[in-house]
């Protein structure tokens, strides 16, 4: 069964590989990038997980991650919201297209909780504004399948 860091890294790697992001603007939680004046960034951070035994040997774990999409606070509010929406849609489309996170061990699917009104983020450092979505990653571990 994978650990939190493995799944988190797989989410970041999938976004980098398929959603037009790179090492400078897509990362596991690290607040240092906020002060660098980047034109956009994606921050993935662990939120929680739930574990359930399906049988004596088979476990199901649901990992939850916050996926924050941020852009600098510049210009008009409507234009900035449009930029946030565009960048967010890239991430949503990528995770929908690659629900198994490029074949990361035991990941069955991912589900992005998308609402019309995601949490709005107001980051003080670097004056960024963005949206937070919750990504659930379903992992089923069966030791007989792993062999």
Tell me the role of every PLM-derived stretch.
Residues 1-34, 46-147:
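Charged, amphipathic alpha-helical segments and their flanking helix caps
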Residues 39-43:
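A short glycine-rich, His/Asp/Glu-containing loop-to-beta-strand
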């Amino acid at each position: 069964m994978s650990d939190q860091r493995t799944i988190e890294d797989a989410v970041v790697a999938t976004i980098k590989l398929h959603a037009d992001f790179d090492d400078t603007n897509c990362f596991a939680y690290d607040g240092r990038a906020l002060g660098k004046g980047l034109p956009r960034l994606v921050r993935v951070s662990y939120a929680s997980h739930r574990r359930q035994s399906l049988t004596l040997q088979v476990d199901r774990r649901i990992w939850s991650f916050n996926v924050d999409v941020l852009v600098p606070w510049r210009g008009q509010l409507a234009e900035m919201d449009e930029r946030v929406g565009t960048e967010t849609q890239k991430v949503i489309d990528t995770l929908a297209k690659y629900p198994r996170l490029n074949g990361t061990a035991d990941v069955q699917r991912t589900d992005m909780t998308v609402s019309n009104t995601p949490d709005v983020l107001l980051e003080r450092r670097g004056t960024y504004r963005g949206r937070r979505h919750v990504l659930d990653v379903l992992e089923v571990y069966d030791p007989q399948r792993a062999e």
